[in-house]
Structures are given as C-alpha cells and as structure tokens.
Regions:
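Membrane-interface "cap" regions at the ends of multi-pass membrane proteins
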Residues: 1-29, 51-55, 67, 190, ...
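Transmembrane alpha-helical segments of multi-pass small-molecule transport proteins
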Residues: 10-19, 87-88, 112-141, 156-163, ...
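Loop-to-transmembrane helix boundary motifs in multi-pass membrane proteins
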Residues: 3, 7-8, 120-129, 218, ...
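Hydrophobic alpha-helical segments of multi-pass membrane transport proteins
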Residues: 157-166, 289-301, 325-329, 348-374
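Extracellular loop-to-transmembrane helix junctions
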Residues: 28-59, 411-413
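Helix-loop-helix junctions that connect adjacent transmembrane segments
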Residues: 120-129, 143, 150-268, 412
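Hydrophobic transmembrane alpha-helices that form the core helical bundles
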Residues: 52-118, 284-308
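TM-loop-TM module centered on a large, flexible mid-protein loop between adjacent transmembrane helices
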Residues: 68-80, 231-291, 312
Length: 413
C-alpha cells in the first residue's frame, strides 16, 4: 500500500504561516520613512536574500540524515564555538517568539471566549487554551500542523481581502508615490530603520529541516514550498503597503509613529482619509489567526531543533520529551512573567540575523568544500550568492546596532 506524500500546498502554507505574523500590520509605519517605492525595494531585497539563505540551509541539509537540524550541521561544518553562538541565537529567538505568541494569543483568546460566553475570562485561562490546542498539534505531527495552518491561512486571506479590498481599490497614486512632497525630500536616509523590520517579516529558517524531514528528503519539493510560501507573504505585504500608504499621506503618519504603529491608532488616523468601516474588528481576527500560524511554524522548528540536539526519536516518549522542553519554558515564563519579553524583544532581530544571514552563507561555503553540491538539490548563484547573503547579514546587523544606539535618522512623520 502506497503512502501518500505531503502536498506542496501544505508545505507552502507552513512557510507562509510562519512568515506572516501580526507584526506585518506595523510594516507601513516602520517603512514610512522610505515610503512606498523605497519599501518595495527593501522588501524585494530582503525577500530575495532571506529566501536564498533558506535555500542554502536546504542544500546543506541534504548531506545529513532526515531530522538533522542546525545543531548537527553547524557543529560538523563550523565547529563547536560557532555551534554555541548559533545555538544561543536560535534558542533565544524561537523561545522568545513562542513566549510572545502565548502572551498575545492568550489575551485575544480570553477576550474572544469572554465575549462569546458573556463573562470575563482570565488571561491565564486564555493562554492555556491557546497554548494547549496549538501545542498539541505540534506534538502530534507536522501533518496536523500542515492541515491546521492551511485552514488558518485561508481565513487570513479572506479577512485580509475583507479589510483591505476597498482601500487597495481606492489607493491614490499621488499619495502612494508622495508626488506632493517638497523638492529635496529625503527617503533613503531612513533605510536603516526599515531593514530590520523587513528581515523579521521573512523568518522561516527554523522550518527548513522540519520540511525536509516532513517531505522525506524531497529537497526540490521543499525548495518549491519555500518559494511559494515566501511569495505569498511578499504579495500580502505589498498589498498592505498599497492599502495604507496609498491612502494615508506620508506627512500624516506622526500620530501613528508616536503610537509605535498601534493598529487602532493607524485605523483612526486612516479613517480621516478613507472609509475604514469595521476594519479594526476584521484586522483583530486576522491578527489572531496570524499569531496562531506563526506559533505553529516557530514551535515546529524549535521542536525539531531540540529533537536534533538530544537525538530524541519520533516515538510517543521521544516526542513527549521534546515537547516538554519546547513548550514548558516559554509557557511557565509567560505565566510567571507576563510582560518580561518587552525588554528582550528588541534584540530578536539581531540574534535572528546571525542564523538567517551569516550562518547559512558560511555553512554552504564549508559544505561545498567538504561534500560538493547538494545530493538532490543545488541552490542557484554559486560563490557570489554566498557573498550576497553574508553581506546582507552584516548590513542588517549594522543597521540594527545603529538603530538601537540611535545613531541613524528616525522618521517622525
């Protein structure tokens, strides 16, 4: 009896679900300095670079057994010192994101249940319900994550169209391209603050090894999943830029920037220039589904990374041990310190750049020297692509450090 192989669609949905988070709603604000044309260039540059680095990880991964993740590859090719650096960066990012998703998703769950039953539900109950359902999916199998994510992505697309269809149709070209701006208006001086935000919008690298295992070593199919999943995200991001930056003039962004991109303030300001209707409620639903899909994608990558470190197998006991180490630390931290991630979240982008930009280029360079090209997949571009991705990582690290130190211009509206 033949075993049905996972679908390309399912793999693409896992990637799209991981990449598209509720944070994308703040992208038009974060890129308001470079405005639409600049944000389009930055998004395309970041998408290509992040996709390429993910495909580099995929090629390297083909030389190792199914289930091997960063720990095995970095230790073998770059040595123990780099493995510690990479391991700390991976764990920091994935655990902290899981923590944040439990906190925000739990809050939305508590409000949703409270509204449905006509009473008040505690944040803790909301967090446990949100966490319990999604963590079970990851513990059970990647196929269940695939199925659940596909449903949620469908809901996200519908709510996105519902919320933005009219705004996209009504986008005004003079506003979108800022044609009324005074002569000599600067845009590119704000690129350094836009880059880290766009990088965070294309993070899926923890899922490459998971997908290769899920697709039973079919690397070309994984590569197509990465292409399709990230392209879906790119199209949604560009449409969201058009919806907002095509209706809300650049010089009117001051209150939104002051509120750090808060969606309610964005919609309130936007309503002065366009019909927004019940956009706030629809975007809340979109955000909830985006947080859920991101939780599934991020924790699936963390789950397989931990299983690789400890060499735990796919038996019930092995997956239970892996699940305990994947989910209990962020859950307990979230319940005990519900706002503790605020300080650390600012450093997620910096840590993510290490293992999504710097490490993949180094891994492929060493892998090509040790093994030659991948067993059944070779990423395009050769040596110059490695240089491109490595420099992309360096540029983003520099941009984030300079932004943290407030040494680059910040657009105020």
């Amino acid at each position: 009896m033949s075993v049905k192989t996972p679908s390309l669609f399912g793999g693409a949905m896992i990637i799209a679900g991981t990449v598209i988070g509720a944070g994308m709603l703040a992208n038009p604000t974060a890129t308001s300095g470079v405005w639409f044309t600049g944000s389009l260039i930055v998004l395309l540059y970041t998408w290509f670079s992040m996709l390429s680095s993910g495909l580099m990880i995929l090629e390297v991964n083909t030389h190792y057994p199914h289930g091997a993740s960063f720990d095995t590859m970095v230790k073998d090719l770059l040595g123990p010192a780099w493995n510690v650096i990479n391991g700390v960066a991976v764990a920091f990012v994935l655990y902290l994101l899981t923590y944040a998703y439990i906190f925000v998703g739990g809050d939305l769950t508590a409000k949703g249940i409270g509204s449905a039953v006509g009473g008040e539900i505690s944040l803790t109950v909301g967090q446990l319900v949100f966490f319990g359902i999604l963590a079970f999916c990851v513990w059970a199998s990647a196929r269940l994550v695939d199925r659940f994510t596909s449903i949620l992505i469908g809901g996200m697309v519908l709510t996105f169209i519902w919320a933005t269809g009219g705004l996209i149709a009504d986008a005004k070209m003079p506003v979108l391209f800022d044609t009324q701006a005074p002569a000599g208006t600067s845009y590119w001086m704000y690129a350094a603050t836009a880059l880290p935000v766009c990088l965070a919008s294309f993070g899926f690298h923890g899922n490459v090894s998971s997908l290769l295992k899920y697709f039973k070593g079919d690397a070309p199919k994984v590569a197509k999943s990465l292409w399709v999943g990230t392209l879906i995200a790119l199209v949604i991001y560009i449409l969201w830029q058009i919806a907002i930056q095509g209706n809300l003039p650049r010089n009117e962004f001051a209150p939104v920037i002051a509120a750090e991109g808060q969606v309610s303030v964005l919609i309130e300001t936007l309503s002065k220039f366009a019909q927004t209707g019940n956009m706030d409620k629809v975007l809340t639903l979109f955000s909830y589904m985006a947080i859920a899909t991101s939780f599934l994608g991020v924790t699936l990558g963390l789950f397989d990374y931990i299983a690789d470190i400890f060499k735990w197998n796919d038996s019930i006991s092995g997956r239970t041990k892996t699940a305990a180490l994947t989910f209990l630390p962020p859950l307990i931290s979230c319940l005990l310190f519900p706002t503790g991630f605020v300080t650390a979240i600012g450093y997620v982008g910096l840590a993510a750049t290490i293992w999504t930009g710097i490490i993949p280029a180094m891994l492929l360079y060493r892998s090509r020297h040790k093994f030659g090209v991948g067993k059944n997949y070779k990423v395009y571009g050769g040596f110059w692509l490695m240089v491109w991705v490595f420099l992309f990582g360096i540029i983003n690290i520099a941009a984030q450090i300079l932004s943290q130190m407030e040494l680059v211009p910040v657009f105020k509206g």
